[in-house]
Amino acid sequence: MVSAVSRQLVNRQLNRVLLRNARIAPFARATRFYSSKYAQESENAKRHKMGLLIAGVAVAGAIVFVTPPQWKKYFRAAKKVEEVAESKEDPVSEAAEEVSESVQESTEEPQQSQEKETADVGNEQAQDESASSGDSEAKKAHDEFADQNEASEKESAPMGESADADQTAKDETVAEKTGNSKSESSESDQSEQDILSSDLEETMETVSEADKELHQISDNTVLSSEEDKTPKAEELKSTSPSGNDEEPKKEDDSSKTIHSLNSEKDMEAVEEEVKQESAYNPDTGEINWDCPCLGGMAHGPCGEEFKAAFSCFVYSEAEPKGIDCVEKFQHMQDCFRRYPEHYAEQLADPADDENVDHEKNLSEGKDTGVDSTPPKDEAYLKTEKEKKIEENASPDEDTASKKD
C-alpha cells in the first residue's frame, strides 16, 4: 500500500512538472525568436547608418577634391551673387548714402584747397631752411674730410717705409725658398736619373748574359753532336790495318766519296738539330716555349714575365738590341727574386756561373783554350795521312767523273 501511494505521488509531481514545462516552452521559444529578431534589426540599422555615413563622406570628398574647376567657379559666383543681393536689399538707404557722400565732398573741397595752399607755403620755407643748413653742413664735412686726409698722409709716410721693408724681406724669403726647392728638385731628378741609368746598365748586362747563354747552348749542342759522330769515324779508321798506304787508289777514292757523303749528311743533321733545339725559328717567326734550351723558365711561376721579356728581346728592332725591353726584364728579375726556390740558378752571380761553365767545359773538353781532339797517337797520325791522300786524290776523281 505504501509503495502504491508513493508511486502515485511521484507520478503526480512528474505530471505537474511536465505541464509546467509544456506551458513555459512556447513562451521561451517566442522570447528567443523576438530577441534574435530585434538583435538582427539593430545590426541592420547599424550597418545602414554606417553605409549612409560613408556615402556622405564620399560625396563631400568628391565635391571638394574631385569637382572640376568650372563647377567650383560656378559655386563661388553663385555665392558672390547672393552676397551682393543681400547687400542691395535696401535701395532707399543706398540713395541716402550717396546724397550724404556728395554733400560731404562739396563741403570738404574748399577746406582741402586752403590746406594745400598753406602746406605749399610751409614746404617752400622748409626747403629754403634745409638748403641753407645743408650748405653749411656740406662745408663742415668738407673741412673735416680735408683734415682727416692730411693726418692720414702724415701717418702713412713712416708706415709706408716700414711696409716696403717688410715686403722686401718677404720677397727675399720667398726667393730663398724657391731656390731651395729648385735645388732640391734638381738633386732629386739627378738621383732618379742615376738610379734609372744603373737599372738600365743592369738590365743590359742581364740581356747580354742571356744572349751569351743562348749562343753557348747552341755551340755546345753543335760540338756535342760533332763529338758524338767523330769518335765513331776515328774508331773505324783506327781499326783499319797499318798497310792502308799500299792499297790501290780505287779503294781510297771510294772511301773518300763515302766519307764526303757522310760528312755532308752529318752537317745537315746537325743543322736540323740546331734548328729544332733553338727556341726561335726565323722561318716561321715563332718561339718554341717548350725548348729545353730555355730551361723550363717559360712554364714556371714567372713564365708570363719570362715570355714577355724573351719575345720582346727576340723581336726587338732597336739599337742596341733589347734597349726597349728593359722594364720587362726588370719585372722578370723581380719575379725571380720572389721565387728563389725555383730560380736559384738565375739569381746566382754571373761570375760564379761563368766559373761553373768553365769547369764543365774543361771536364768535357769543350773549352775554347783546350783542344777537344784526342791525343795524337799512331792511329790518329795514320788517319791524318789518309785524309791528306784523299784530298790529293780528289781532283783526279772530279776529272774522271766529268769524263764519264
UniProtKB/Swiss-Prot annotation:
- The yes or no answer to whether the keyword Nucleotidyltransferase is present is no
Q: Which GO terms describe its molecular function?
A: protein-disulfide reductase activity
- What range does the transit peptide cover? 1-34
Mitochondrial matrix compartment ranges equal 35-50
- Annotated region (Disordered) at 84-287, 346-404
Per UniProt, what is one Pfam family of this protein?
A: CHCH
Name of the protein described by the UniProt record: Mitochondrial intermembrane space import and assembly protein 40
